[in-house]
Design a protein with these regions (language model features):
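C-terminal beta-strand-loop-alpha-helix "lid" module of Rossmann-like NAD(P)-dependent dehydrogenases
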Residues: 1-290
């Protein structure tokens, strides 16, 4: 067999092996996407009821540290990315948006410090020598309520302790399997309108009697609200990651199939040419002996 045919056979085998890997990764990402979507849907009733309670308490005045706007000296910027790659432009989109925002908010008297969730954001900002306060690189796209609450509690504690006077979160909002959108919001300090607009009005609202008082109930609900916002930010980011990876690996699998078809066509043409040449040589030799 001519060397060109051997080389084409080797390339076809290599692409087929790669196609098997990308197909398997697509299936794994699809399974993770379904689980993440189920977790998001399951969390909505709790979030809706929490928002309804906060909306009912919107007119309550309370002196709470989460509402306190202090002189801004240090700002903590949380960036949520993935730990693994092969998910298209997912990580590039969120890290680029965060970096553009950081450059636009580079004030002489304000220190911007990064708190990254995901190995990809950690690597990106390390290469560019941005100050990283903490990096969490072991979540692996898993929606873990206990870990998410621990992150939220840490952010609240450090804000209350005046270590940072503002906390901004960069995440990716899940729109659909094929669509996701980088976004950011101020987590702390809370603004009264944030809690008023937390939920859209849905028909007649329920009237509640608060014990021991509306102020006490609001004070108890605010940390839960922050926890819920952190949960949504991380859960939507991870769901977007799985959707992006499934789409990316699906495209890679399709492209591998097209490449296999092209290489097979080249191989068949090369084999046909080799056979034709051999026949011509045999006929030529027979004619010479005749």
């Amino acid at each position: 067999m001519p060397a060109s045919l051997k080389e084409l056979d080797r390339r076809i085998r290599s692409v087929k092996n790669t196609q098997q890997i990308t197909r398997a990764m697509k299936m794994v990402a699809a399974a993770k996407l379904r689980r993440s979507q189920d977790r998001l849907v399951a969390a909505r009733p709790y979030a809706a009821k929490l928002d309804e309670l906060l909306q009912g308490l919107a007119g309550t005045s309370i002196d709470h540290p989460f509402f306190e706007e202090r002189e801004l000296r240090r700002r903590l910027v949380v960036v949520v990315s993935s730990d693994k790659g092969l998910c298209g432009s997912y990580n590039a989109n969120i890290t680029r948006e965060a970096e553009v925002w950081l450059k636009a908010h580079a004030e002489a008297d304000v220190e911007n410090v990064l708190y990254v969730v995901g190995r990809k954001a950690n690597d990106y900002f390390k290469r560019r020598q941005w100050p990283i306060d903490r990096a969490i690189t072991d979540l692996n796209g898993t929606i873990d309520l206990e870990r998410f609450n621990a992150i939220a509690d840490e952010l609240m504690h450090r804000f209350v302790e005046d270590e940072f006077q503002e906390v901004v979160v960069f995440t990716t909002r899940f729109v659909s399997t094929l669509s996701y959108q980088p976004t950011h919001f101020t987590l702390l300090p809370l603004k009264p309108e944030d809690e008023e607009d937390a939920a859209e009005p849905a028909g007649a609202s329920t009237e509640y009697i608060y014990e021991p008082s509306a102020e006490a109930v609001l004070a108890a609900l605010l940390p839960k609200s922050v926890r819920n916002r952190v949960f949504n930010a991380l859960a939507e980011a991870f769901t977007s990651e799985h959707g992006a990876r499934m789409t990316s690996m699906g495209s890679a699998t399709d492209n591998a199939g097209e490449l296999i078809d092209t290489l097979t066509l080249f191989r068949n043409r090369a084999r046909q040419a080799a056979i034709t040449q051999e026949i011509s040589e045999i006929v030529g030799g027979a004619n010479a002996l005749a």
